[in-house]
Amino acid sequence: MSKMNFDQFIDKAFPVRNPFSRNEFGGVTNAIKYFAVRVSFIFYRLGITANQISLFSALLAIPAFVIIYQATIEEANIIKFIVGYLLMGTVLFIDFVDGPLSKTSKYKYFVGDDLDNLPPDIATMGTLLIFGLLSNNIYFTALFWTNAVFLFTYLRNTLIHIPKEKEWILRLICSRFSLLSVRVFVATLFPLVCIMYIYNQELATTIVKILILFYLINSALWIRITLETKIKK
């Protein structure tokens, strides 16, 4: 079977065609999607599948975290941090690439969605772990790491139990532009705090501790809200 040309590919993989027409997304997100669709087409022509690049992306996150950790906490090296974060940026960019590419496959894999979510989940968890270390306090680190486990377990499993009148907490910590989203936390807040840590460790640790307390308070509120949903036995 012959390969599709770009027009045929985009009709199948991204029917919207022009990402900038999506007003619900920001200009940066749409610009990234514009380039991601074209990179998807290149991978398609090369015979590389969405599952393959998702696995590559997950593996790429490992050296990215090692370099970011060393550059920020051990060496205070801004150049090395930029290199590490460029690797992390590649992991995040691939998450935009594999979606259109997956639509060209003849098969739908039962674990396809889980595999697609793996790299951004690794990116989020890894940045949360490093963020906790930036407090320079074992108690704050332990609290934040425990909270990270909460975010990936209890929070995800109880989304349906948030009542409509309390949906403000969804927007605060569980929406596309929430304080824990990839766009806000991983792509913006985390690198800014790391750079601050490299140049002014005392100020950075203070800000990290304040943010950790903020996230913990929101997690406690989440638990309280979900416990309000109950039925009689």
Where are these regions (language model features)?
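A feature for the membrane-embedded catalytic helix bundles of lipid/isoprenoid biosynthetic enzymes
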Residues: 1-40, 117-233
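Helix-boundary and loop/linker segments of multi-pass membrane transporters
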Residues: 15, 43, 73-77
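Membrane interfacial helix-start motif at the N-side
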Residues: 37-51
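Short low-polarity hydrophobic stretches
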Residues: 49-54, 191-195
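Membrane-embedded alpha-helical segments that form the functional core of polytopic membrane enzymes
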Residues: 50-111, 143, 202-216
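Acidic active-site catalytic centers that drive phospho-/nucleotidyl reactions
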Residues: 95-98, 116, 120
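Internal catalytic or translocation cores that form aromatic/hydrophobic pockets or channels
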Residues: 104-119, 132
